[in-house]
Design a protein with these regions (language model features):
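Alpha/beta-hydrolase-fold catalytic nucleophile elbow
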Residues: 128
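Short catalytic micro-motifs in class I SAM-dependent methyltransferases
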Residues: 102-103
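Structural signature of beta-strand start/N-cap positions in the alpha/beta core
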Residues: 41, 64, 94-96
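A conserved beta-strand element that flanks and buttresses the S-adenosyl-L-methionine
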Residues: 99
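Conserved alpha-helix/loop element of class I SAM-dependent methyltransferases that forms part
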Residues: 19-38
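A short glycine-rich, Lys/Arg-flanked "PGG" loop and its adjoining helix->strand segment in the class I
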Residues: 111-125
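Class I SAM-dependent methyltransferase SAM/SAH-binding core
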Residues: 43, 49-87
Length: 128
């Protein structure tokens, strides 16, 4: 027996408003502490639609966050560039910090993703 479409919409709305939003806020709180205080330019690797980065910038307004993702959504909260999952389209040490949140388990080559993050980071790579 299938779930009626109205109940799916209701479930998605409740999940988005209560559970997902709380998760975004919690992640932003933790990242705001984990990112070094002298960082300005930050790359959110695997940023999705950029909600976590946007919430992070509310806590740390000095941060300028760009994102990359293998799937660029039609609407994003931050500037997002397409990423092939292998080579980041940035020069060495281009960012002060790179964040990787819930991404590595989706990759075929996590070591390569980490190496690329380290290459474009002048400072820290923050992984969750």
């Amino acid at each position: 027996m299938s779930v009626p479409s109205w109940s799916k919409r209701l479930l998605n709305a409740v999940h988005g408003a209560l559970i997902f939003r709380r998760r975004v806020e919690s992640l932003a709180d933790r990242l705001a502490i984990a990112i070094p205080s002298d960082a300005i330019r930050v790359l959110d690797l695997g940023c999705g639609d950029g909600q976590v980065a946007w919430a992070l910038m509310q806590r740390r307004p000095e941060l300028v966050i760009e994102g990359v993702d293998v799937l660029v959504r039609p609407e994003t909260q931050i500037p997002v560039m397409a990423y092939d999952g292998a080579t980041l389209p940035f020069a060495d040490q281009y960012f002060d910090c790179v964040t990787i949140v819930d991404v590595l388990h989706h990759t075929d080559e996590p070591a390569r993703v980490l190496a690329e993050a380290a290459r474009v980071a002048a400072g820290s790579v923050v992984i969750k």
